[in-house]
Amino acid sequence: MARYNVLLWDKDNDLYETIISTDNRETAETVANSLNKFVHQDRLLSMNNREPFDAVYIEDRMYKEDNLEYIEYKD
C-alpha cells in the first residue's frame, strides 16, 4: 500500500517539513493544492528561518522508494 506525504520545501536550507501523511491519494492532493495557494502568496513561513516556503510536494512512498512529485514552484 502506498503512503503519501505532503511536504513543504524550504529552498534556502534544503529542508522538507511533512504536513500530513495519508494512504489516500485524493486527500494528499487536496491538502497539497490548498497549501500551494498559501505558498504562492508567501503566507507559510518556515520555522527554521522564518522565510516563506518555496514549494509543495507530494512524496509517494511505495515499496520503500521515495518519489517526490513536484506540485508547483513559485517564481
Place the predicted regions along the sequence by residue.
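Compositionally biased, low-complexity intrinsically disordered regions
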Residues: 1, 14, 26, 51-53, ...
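Short aromatic-glycine-(Arg/Gly/Cys) micro-motifs in beta-strand/loop hairpins
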Residues: 1-18, 45-47
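Generic ordered-secondary-structure signal
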Residues: 9, 18-20, 52, 59
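A short, exposed loop/beta-hairpin motif centered on an aromatic-Gly-Thr core
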Residues: 14-30
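Short, mixed-charge low-complexity intrinsically disordered segments
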Residues: 34-75
